[in-house]
Amino acid sequence: MDKYECSICGYIYDEAEGDDGNVAAGTKFADLPADWVCPTCGADKDAFVKMD
């Protein structure tokens, strides 16, 4: 599974873990709702970059 980093605040979305905002573990970044935002700073999904 992949990880994505918020380019604004550095929050890391880990697909294997989901997030504390009712996103289940195993949820792919591409499958997050269009209105999902960074739980730390509120940035849109387009502020995230895939980590190597």
UniProtKB/Swiss-Prot annotation:
InterPro entries: Rubredoxin (IPR024922), Rubredoxin-like_dom (IPR024934), Rubredoxin_dom (IPR024935), Rubredoxin_ET (IPR050526), Rubredoxin_Fe_BS (IPR018527)
Cofactor comment: Binds 1 Fe(3+) ion per subunit.
Organism domain of life: Bacteria
Cofactor: Fe(3+)
Binding annotation for Fe cation: 6, 9, 38, 41
Annotated PROSITE patterns: RUBREDOXIN (PS00202), RUBREDOXIN_LIKE (PS50903)
Xref: Gene3D superfamilies: 2.20.28.10
Rubredoxin-like domain span: 1-51
Keyword annotations of the record: Electron transport, Iron, Metal-binding, Transport
GO terms, molecular function: electron transfer activity; iron ion binding
GO biological process, one term: alkane catabolic process
Pfam families recorded: Rubredoxin
Record-stated family: Belongs to the rubredoxin family.
Function: Rubredoxin is a small nonheme, iron protein lacking acid-labile sulfide. Its single Fe, chelated to 4 Cys, functions as an electron acceptor and may also stabilize the conformation of the molecule.
Protein name: Rubredoxin
Organism name: Megasphaera elsdenii
